[in-house]
């Protein structure tokens, strides 16, 4: 882009003026602007007594505040995802409850003596159960300049559901499931075309709850594998991949309408007929960024049978035989997804006992898929790779998906990082070998793993010219979403955390990106939370348009998240603007 001399001088002038401005901060608890007790009481009254003062979930186990019965419950349930959904003072990844930069944490250890600090846990939670209550909470935060976060089930892996000194809007209480045979979008003038079977859900409906209803009524939706994820929250706002993606597309491809409370407290309906810019943005533009979604209408499909094939590879170490098994699995994924089938493989190259394991699960809906998996079994046999095989025929896919799968991990500390791998790479002659070589070079130790999700290709790619949404364009050429999960040891120090982050950011993720010559897109739901070039990694060429939508609907950044749209203007916790934010704000207008 070429700038005129006049424009260059204008930019320089703006920059000089910016340096003279003070940093803008949200109101903090120690500030005079912090709401009084009476004002918090007024908010509580306006939302029908749903305001909660939050303290860390581990507090009852601290020596200074020890409560045996409550501590017993915390210790027994800390790894239970459903329990954490119901406790707004907790998150699924406990690493986001702590604030290591300030040495603030609250260990879940009986009679802990190291103290218990608030960390990143919000100070208050508005446990809303209606749109009106959401509006009241949003308006309260806006008019008092509070740091606001949106939490549904607490699954967010990049820390977007928590922030120090904040007010939380808890949406898990927004329930309701309404199935219709022929959904008609809302329109203010004229008439809209019916769109076929659909289901409208409250933001707090869990994936497992929706699958269970689908099992009863004979429909299935495109959701994820974790039964405790709020499907209307971060799932669809991150794009949403699932086992039906190769045959149907992404979850966000099938969002027909959303209801959302925006930064000015308005209740908005967005679909293809009205508020189209907002409708485009929330389908892949990131959760907690454009407002509080209160309900979503999803396209529903007829329920169907499926066969789940499990292949377990265990070896004493991650030796040549083990990696040959991984390569063999990778080689069949293109043809598997071509036919609308899918698969996931979770790999632990090293365990505490020294063994290595690869757990493969294939989801087939047709004869072609069965043939592909039979070929995989024969190839493993031919290479002398030991494995255990299981088959599970499911006459009702929704019923199978409704049951917990053991993937709802909770009460753990993990730093994720992900990258898309294209169909062309994996389907090429040397592709599986190149990918396997890169994976074996990651040098993952005990407590760390990677997952290979073959949820791209097929209809995800075919929807490139059919669906106009904010998801990263690389989705439309991707076959795999590859996610590295680095385990963080209990009681970790800031130094340990930074060391793990450095390895992931400067070595492991670059190795994977180098497979295709540089930066590739990443799945927003499991992406690296400190991504420097997050704009490109999460949204690519869509970012500029997303930023314009953000400026139009939330010009003061009431809704801001870590590595979210517009977050480059703010510090990591979204509490204060950066020194150069005035220049950034000015440039955003051009």
From Swiss-Prot:
PROSITE patterns: FAD_PCMH. Malbrancheamides have the ability to inhibit calmodulin, calmodulin-dependent phosphodiesterase (PDE1), and induce both endothelium-independent and endothelium-dependent relaxant effects, suggesting their potential as vasorelaxant agents. Its cofactor is FAD. Its EC number is 1.-.-.-. Disulfide bonds: none annotated. Glycans are attached at residues 44, 80, 103, 178, 396. Residues 117-303 form the FAD-binding PCMH-type domain. One of its GO terms (molecular function) is oxidoreductase activity. Keywords: FAD, Flavoprotein, Glycoprotein, Oxidoreductase, Signal. The keyword tRNA-binding does not apply. It is an enzyme of class 1 (oxidoreductase). Residues 1-18 form the signal peptide. It holds the Pfam family BBE. The keyword Flavoprotein applies. Belongs to the oxygen-dependent FAD-linked oxidoreductase family. FAD-linked oxidoreductase; part of the gene cluster that mediates the biosynthesis of malbrancheamide, a dichlorinated fungal indole alkaloid that belongs to a family of natural products containing a characteristic bicyclo[2.2.2]diazaoctane core. The first step of malbrancheamide biosynthesis involves coupling of L-proline and L-tryptophan by malG, a bimodular NRPS, to produce L-Pro-L-Trp aldehyde through reductive offloading. This is FAD-linked oxidoreductase malF.
